[in-house]
Structure formats: structure tokens, C-alpha cells
């Protein structure tokens, strides 16, 4: 199977991957080598720190061989067609992990690849990040049902995957964005379908940051302008400040709220220093959990291959 976004998973699948992630975290030096004898191509059109390190180390600690290629070594759809790249790589490696600019490139790669393709980030989705986020919420809150999670800022790829992941585990999700910066409309429809299918959770889009943050158990934000984004910086800096997670906004959330950011953070913009470094912040646990939950993704995929 391919993991291009979370809508290919069921609730049971998501909970199983989280369970695997928690297991790998508790048994980091003692767990089984499920990738022994296997090679994993890790492709980066977009530079990365956490994604590259976490996937590289995950493959290594699972006994596999990570083959990392950066933007200067791969030319998806340029010097060679994506079809040819995918077909050839499928004969060399056991899995392809790709961080790309265009989600459609991933879809084409998955169409022609004979091995699983895992989305390590695209302009539409960031599923592995959200699996790590859900694992972090599970660690801190012990549950999903009945929790309110509020995302504030730009309705970007992280936001898209977050509303799918939150829908799958039954949380009540509020997305607070400026007008015109809402998450992808098709993803919103998918999330609402998931909520209707399970009969749990909810999804509310609002342009009011206080409505989003009020009584929240989890506050989440991301950068206002993503890498490769063509947003007008002056416009963003004019209309996004009310959606900043700061001490004032924190007062509207629950006393035991946790604050999340997928990093890297532009401190002083989408989140203030005192909040990201404060007692409610779980950003470093969240970042660490990328490593563990991605091991869980490999285990899940190879069990079903």
C-alpha cells in the first residue's frame, strides 16, 4: 500500500500505527529489525532537517539501508519522467519515501511504483507529521474522544492532514484562519465524510481565532508561509497576527492545554518565545515522535504488503 495521505487509513489503522510508535519509543534499542535486508530510497526535492534525520535513523535502527537523494540528484518530471523514475526505483529498493513540492508527483509515482510510496511532505499533505502529532496527544491526554483541537494560521498541508487525522480518531477540530486561507475544500469534505461514517468528532472552520482557541485541549500552529509558497509576505504579515499563539490567546484555552508546532518555527510570528518555550509546549516531544511513529508506519506497511 501507499501512504500519500491519511484518508487511505481507517481509525483502526491510525490507532495501530500510534501503538507501534509508542512501542518503538519504549524499546528503542531492543526492538525487532523489520527492515533487515531491505533498502529504502529517501528522496528530497525540498530540503529538510527533522524529516531527513528521522527517516534516515528510523530505517537504520530498523535494520535497513537508507539511500538518501537530495534535490540536486533527483529531477522528478524534468530530466526523466516520474513514470520511468518510479519503475526503475521499484526494481532497486523496497520502499520509496519522498518529500516533494507537488502532490501530483507523488500520485504519479505511486501509480507506477511496484513498491510502497510514503509521503514525507507535499504541498497538499504531511501525513507522517500528523501521525506523530496524534501519538503525542495520546501520550499527554491518554485519549482522543471528547478532546478539542484548534489549529490556527494558514490552512496548509499540515492543516489538511491534521483535519483528516483528527476526524479519524474522533476529536472535535476547529480550524481558525484568515478569510481566503482555509484548508483544501476537497480535504474538508473528506474529513466530514469520515466524521459522518464514525459518528464521532466534528470539524468547524472559523475566521475567529478566539472561537477556535476557546476551551481547547490542544492548540496547534505552523509557519504562515511554507517553503516554495508564493503568498504575498506583506499581506500575510498584515492579516495573520491575530492568529498568533501567544500568552493572551492561551488564556482562552483550557488550563492544561498542550501547544504544538511541527517545526521549524518562526518565533515571534505564528508563535511567541514564551509559549513555545513554556510549560504548555510539547514541540520537542512532538519532533522526537516523528522518529518512532515512522518506524510504526514501516511496520504497518510491511505487514500488509
Curated annotation (Swiss-Prot):
Coiled coil: none annotated. Keywords: Amino-acid biosynthesis, Arginine biosynthesis, Cytoplasm, Transferase. Carbamoyl phosphate binds at residues 48-51, 99, 126-129, 262-263, 290. InterPro entries: Asp/Orn_carbamoyltranf_P-bd (IPR006132), Asp/Orn_carbamoylTrfase (IPR006130), Asp/Orn_carbamoylTrfase_sf (IPR036901), Asp_carbamoyltransf_Asp/Orn-bd (IPR006131), Orn/put_carbamltrans (IPR002292), OTCase_ArgI (IPR024904). Pfam families: OTCace, OTCace_N. Pathway: Amino-acid biosynthesis; L-arginine biosynthesis; L-arginine from L-ornithine and carbamoyl phosphate: step 1/3. L-ornithine binds at residues 157, 222, 226-227. Its EC number is 2.1.3.3. GO terms for molecular function: amino acid binding; ornithine carbamoyltransferase activity. It catalyses: carbamoyl phosphate + L-ornithine = L-citrulline + phosphate + H(+). The keyword Protein transport does not apply. The keyword Metal-binding does not apply. SUPFAM superfamilies: Aspartate/ornithine carbamoyltransferase. Its main location: cytoplasm. One of its GO terms (cellular component) is cytoplasm. It is found in: Cytoplasm. One of its GO terms (biological process) is L-arginine biosynthetic process. PANTHER family: ORNITHINE CARBAMOYLTRANSFERASE, MITOCHONDRIAL, ORNITHINE TRANSCARBAMYLASE, MITOCHONDRIAL. Belongs to the aspartate/ornithine carbamoyltransferase superfamily. OTCase family. NCBIfam families: orni_carb_tr, PRK00779.1. Reversibly catalyzes the transfer of the carbamoyl group from carbamoyl phosphate (CP) to the N(epsilon) atom of ornithine (ORN) to produce L-citrulline. This is Ornithine carbamoyltransferase. It comes from Methanocaldococcus jannaschii (strain ATCC 43067 / DSM 2661 / JAL-1 / JCM 10045 / NBRC 100440) (Methanococcus jannaschii). The gene is argF.
Amino acid at each position: 500500500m501507499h501512504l500519500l495521505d491519511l484518508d487511505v487509513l481507517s481509525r483502526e489503522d491510525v490507532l495501530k500505527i500510534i501503538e507501534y510508535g509508542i512501542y518503538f519509543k519504549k524499546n528503542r534499542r531492543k526492538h525487532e529489525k523489520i527492515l533487515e535486508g531491505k533498502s529504502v530510497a529517501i528522496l528530497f526535492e525540498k530540503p529538510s532537517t527533522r524529516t531527513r534525520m528521522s527517516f534516515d535513523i528510523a530505517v537504520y535502527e530498523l535494520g535497513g539501508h537508507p539511500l538518501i537523494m537530495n534535490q540536486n540528484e533527483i529531477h522528478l518530471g524534468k530530466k526523466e519522467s516520474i513514470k520511468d523514475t518510479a519503475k526503475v526505483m521499484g526494481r532497486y529498493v523496497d520502499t520509496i519515501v519522498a518529500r516533494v513540492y507537488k502532490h501530483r508527483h507523488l500520485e504519479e509515482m505511486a501509480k507506477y511504483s511496484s513498491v510502497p510510496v510514503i509521503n514525507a511532505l507535499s504541498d497538499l499533505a504531511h501525513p507522517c507529521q500528523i501521525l506523530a502529532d496524534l501519538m503525542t496527544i495520546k501520550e499527554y491526554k491518554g485519549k482522543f474522544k471528547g478532546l478539542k483541537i484548534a489549529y490556527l494560521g494558514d490552512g496548509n498541508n499540515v492543516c489538511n492532514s491534521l483535519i483528516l487525522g483528527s476526524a479519524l480518531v474522533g476529536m472535535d477540530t476547529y480550524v481558525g484562519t484568515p478569510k481566503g486561507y482555509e484548508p483544501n475544500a476537497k480535504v474538508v469534505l473528506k474529513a466530514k465524510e469520515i466524521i459522518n461514517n464514525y459518528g464521532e468528532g466534528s470539524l468547524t472552520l472559523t475566521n475567529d481565532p478566539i472561537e477556535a482557541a476557546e476551551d481547547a485541549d490542544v492548540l496547534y500552529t505552523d509557519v504562515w508561509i511554507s517553503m516554495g509558497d508564493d503568498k504575498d509576505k506583506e499581506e500575510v504579515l498584515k492579516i495573520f497576527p491575530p492568529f498568533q499563539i501567544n500568552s493572551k490567546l492561551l488564556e482562552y484555552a483550557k488550563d492544561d492545554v498542550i501547544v504544538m508546532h511541527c517545526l521549524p518555527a518562526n518565533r515571534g510570528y505564528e508563535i511567541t518565545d514564551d509559549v513555545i518555550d513554556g510549560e504548555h509546549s510539547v514541540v520537542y516531544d512532538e519532533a522526537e515522535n516523528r522518529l518512532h511513529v515512522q518506524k510504526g508506519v514501516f511496520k504497518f506497511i510491511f505487514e500488509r504488503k
